[in-house]
Amino acid sequence: MILDESIQFGNKKLLLVLAVPESVCGNNKALTYSDLTTLVLKVSASWKSEDIALELPLHIDLEQIAYCISDNGSNLTCAFKSLNLKHIMDVNHQFSLIIKSVFENNVLFNNYTKALSLFRAQKSLSKIARIVSPNQRIMSRFMNFTPLFQWGIKMIILLDNNKLTQEEETALSFLKPYRSFIFDTYQILIRLNNMQKFLKNNGFSDKNAKEAMSLFSDMNSNNSLKIKEQLEAYFADLSSKTEDNKTICCSSDIIESCFSRYKAIVKGNKSVGISDLCLCIAAMLGENNLDKTRCAMETVKMKRLKEWNAKNISKTLFAEKKELNKILTEFIC
């Protein structure tokens, strides 16, 4: 089972719970929409652990749940704990936490990123703008800063081969003290990205963990050793939750993809908040989803849809504003 809550839409959040057959894990491919079944699609102003723990048993026999995949949100993890469910930490979020723990207070890293910010601010509109570094993420900055080091590698290669103008070489002179740090960090990030891709496609097992760790066999810098130590701890935790010779899924990327698809559909009118249009998520999941959706649209009555809406969506932000304006109109008139 995969769970997550959406980002804030207006004043509400959407809880999405997906069921995944164990048989589709470890088939040399990442999960797809056809592998999923929607269990819960419900809106609330907030989702506390108690709310989630009460909701899950209403939709599935807990004995059917082998494990739950999610990020490390306290509301989700506490809900799993109260229901005695195994929690598998999503590999993407876990790797992000590992990277953060190693680099957040690293002097070289902080000085390098500050230097890039200053360089970008000074040169983005100049005649040497072609060599300006990419923007840094503000939110979840440790989930993907590979582009910053990829850019650094490219600039060093151009400098080493005298392919830049004198002005560009002078502007990039600040990179010299970070040369070895850039190369080492880039190698760490490339290996982590490859490891993540391998685990998303092949799932986690003790055998796959050994193969994944082999990607770091030739790395022995201080930062890489710190990364390896935490990876081993993460894999040990997953191993303790995995039955012998079994492969489990360890990525919740697919649920993030569902939210992204929904956001793309409603992006033109976010002020409405979360409406029954979120049913588009359920419509795009499962096998033969097109035929099933067509059948549902032809057979489900509006009365039933309104009942579902009242129970799971309640009033949208747009409806609340409309109601308030109606009250205001009565006073003005």
Residue ranges: model-predicted function:
Residues 1-68, 74, 78-93, 101-107, ...:
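RNase H-like nuclease fold core
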Residues 73-82, 95, 120-333:
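Acidic/histidine-rich catalytic cores and adjacent linkers
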Residues 98:
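Conserved His + Asp/Glu catalytic blocks
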Residues 105-116:
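A catalytic-pocket lid/entrance helix-loop region that shapes and gates access to the active site
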